[in-house]
Every structure is written in C-alpha cells, then in structure tokens.
C-alpha cells in the first residue's frame, strides 16, 4: 500500500514538470497560440451567455 502511494506521488511530480515544459525550438513560433489556448473554453462559456441574452433568456 505504501509503495502504491509513493508511486502516485512520484508520478504526480512528473506531471507537474510536463505542464511547465517549454515547446521545442522548432515550434517556438506557436508559443503565443499555446499561451492563449487554455482561455478558449472560457470564450465558449461567455458566448453561451451572449447568445442567451440575444434570445432574451428563453
């Protein structure tokens, strides 16, 4: 059981390093796009409210 818990914490530390990784140099031109990508779902949420306001929240 302790082995399983330690394996979980070891693997979770690897995931945090992956999220902070940089793109390879060949893809450096896509850095601005990659920076904006996590915000895109928020735009869809806001679009839903704008759409409902346009149809008077039926």
Curated annotation (Swiss-Prot):
The keyword GTP-binding does not apply. One of its GO terms (cellular component) is chloroplast thylakoid membrane. GO terms for biological process: photosynthesis. Its main location: plastid. Keywords: Chloroplast, Membrane, Photosynthesis, Photosystem II, Plastid, Reaction center, Thylakoid, Transmembrane, Transmembrane helix. Pfam families: PsbK. Residues 1-21 form a propeptide. It is found in: Plastid, Chloroplast thylakoid membrane. Disulfide bonds: none annotated. It is a single-pass membrane protein. The chain crosses the membrane at residues 29-49. InterPro entries: PSII_PsbK, PSII_PsbK_sf. PSII is composed of 1 copy each of membrane proteins PsbA, PsbB, PsbC, PsbD, PsbE, PsbF, PsbH, PsbI, PsbJ, PsbK, PsbL, PsbM, PsbT, PsbX, PsbY, PsbZ, Psb30/Ycf12, at least 3 peripheral proteins of the oxygen-evolving complex and a large number of cofactors. It forms dimeric complexes. Belongs to the PsbK family. One of the components of the core complex of photosystem II (PSII). PSII is a light-driven water:plastoquinone oxidoreductase that uses light energy to abstract electrons from H(2)O, generating O(2) and a proton gradient subsequently used for ATP formation. It consists of a core antenna complex that captures photons, and an electron transfer chain that converts photonic excitation into a charge separation. This is Photosystem II reaction center protein K. It comes from Chaetosphaeridium globosum (Charophycean green alga). The lineage of its organism: Eukaryota, Viridiplantae, Streptophyta, Coleochaetophyceae, Coleochaetales. The gene is psbK.
